[in-house]
């Protein structure tokens, strides 16, 4: 797999933002990784960008940032301008709330940092299909 130090993208805080993020992931990773891994990463990124748009971008002109690093493993961060929330207090409902569960299931590691002005959710994924 080729190495890349870092690529930073601005994703419009609009309804098509998650699709834009999935397209970026497909363009960046499809030639390097098996389709199943790329699809997992597209799903994770789509969930995080959706959360960033819905919960973090009160003003639609403020983009969500997608920070993609490929260096032996995939490390990705999604940054928005929302205050975040405590993951242990988040409850799933029929209408939503399953995004971070998807992130947890499909990534090798993930985490979140937040302040009153910004939330960063990150994940790591090894570039192989065989994982425990």
Regions found by a protein language model. Give the residues of each.
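Short amphipathic alpha-helical interface segments enriched in basic and hydrophobic/aromatic residues
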Residues: 30, 50-54
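Conserved short strand/loop->alpha-helix "switch" segment adjacent to the catalytic nucleotide/phosphoryl-transfer site
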Residues: 22-46
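Short alpha-helix carrying the canonical HExxH Zn2+-binding catalytic motif
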Residues: 45-46, 50, 102
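Conserved beta-strand-loop-beta-strand hairpin that lines the nucleotide-binding pocket
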Residues: 1-8, 53-132
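Heptad-repeat coiled-coil signal-transmission/dimerization helices
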Residues: 18-25, 100
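STAS-typified acidic loop motif
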Residues: 8-19
């Amino acid at each position: 797999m080729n190495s890349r130090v870092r690529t930073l993208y601005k994703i419009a805080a609009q309804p098509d933002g998650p699709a834009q993020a999935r397209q970026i992931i497909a363009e960046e990773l499809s030639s390097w990784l098996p389709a199943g891994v790329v699809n997992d990463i597209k799903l994770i990124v789509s969930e995080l960008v959706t959360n960033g748009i819905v919960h973090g971008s009160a003003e639609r002109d403020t983009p969500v940032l997608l920070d993609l690093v490929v260096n032996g493993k995939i490390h990705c961060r999604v940054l928005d301008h929302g205050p975040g929330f405590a993951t242990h207090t988040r409850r799933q409902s029929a209408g939503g709330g399953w995004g971070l569960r998807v992130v947890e299931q499909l990534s090798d590691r993930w985490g979140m940092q937040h302040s009153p002005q910004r939330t960063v959710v990150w994940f790591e994924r090894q570039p192989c299909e065989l994982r425990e």
